[in-house]
Regions:
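Juxtamembrane interface elements at the cytosolic ends of transmembrane helices
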Residues: 30-43, 69-81, 100-122
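Predominantly late transmembrane helices and immediately cytosolic-facing juxtamembrane segments
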Residues: 40-45, 113-118, 125-152, 166
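Short aromatic-rich membrane-water interface segments that cap or initiate transmembrane helices
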Residues: 16, 84-100, 161-162
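Alpha-helical transmembrane segments of multi-pass integral membrane proteins
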Residues: 56-71, 94-110, 131-145
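Early transmembrane hairpin module of multi-pass membrane proteins
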Residues: 2-8, 88-92, 101-102, 112, ...
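Membrane-interface helix-loop-helix modules in multi-pass inner-membrane proteins
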Residues: 2-58, 79, 154-163
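Flexible, glycine/proline-enriched loop segments at strand-loop-helix junctions
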Residues: 47, 53-56, 86-91, 102
């Protein structure tokens, strides 16, 4: 609501560009919430299904949040103050890669939280997972940090010209 009140033009352009990934992110969040509620009311036989629904909803929300970020970094075509792109302009290799990178980020965050809160076998499993995910995340950060200025001359210019450097 704050974005709409402060910057209505930016709000309309951004929302128009990312309707589909934002709606899919919302569906993931809804699925996650419903799964969380129904898991505790389900029979033992059905709990595994609700666990999978929770995982799927969480992964979808995270992935489409990353896809939206990647699409935003790629840029939004605007003409005369209106969104000038198509319904799937947000869907490209960079945005999908960014979505996967955010999945790795949140997985690392979750595994480190479990390291703090658990002990025993789960703690050991999460330590191993966190080490692996840290390396995966570093690869995503490195790739995105290289990809961004190589794909966008304007960003490369801001990053690598004087007085911005140093």
């Amino acid at each position: 609501a704050g974005l709409l009140a402060a910057f209505p033009l930016a709000y309309s352009v951004i929302l128009s560009a990312f309707y589909l990934p934002l709606i899919l992110m919302l569906i993931g969040l809804i699925f996650r919430g419903v799964a969380f509620e129904f898991r505790f009311k389900a029979s033992d036989r059905r709990r595994g299904s609700w666990d999978l629904a929770f995982i799927g909803g969480s992964a979808a929300a995270t992935f489409f949040q990353g896809v939206t970020l990647g699409g935003f970094i790629e840029g939004i075509p605007v003409r005369d103050g209106r969104y000038a792109g198509g319904a799937f302009d947000w869907l490209n290799a960079f945005s999908v890669f960014t979505g996967c990178g955010l999945l790795a980020t949140y997985a690392l965050l979750g595994s480190t939280w479990l390291i703090m809160k658990t002990e025993g076998l789960l703690l050991l499993r999460m330590r191993l997972m966190a080490r692996t995910l840290a390396w995966v995340l570093l690869m995503f950060i490195g790739a995105i940090s290289l990809w961004t200025p190589l794909a966008h001359e304007r960003i490369a210019e801001r990053w690598f010209t004087w007085p911005n450097m140093g």
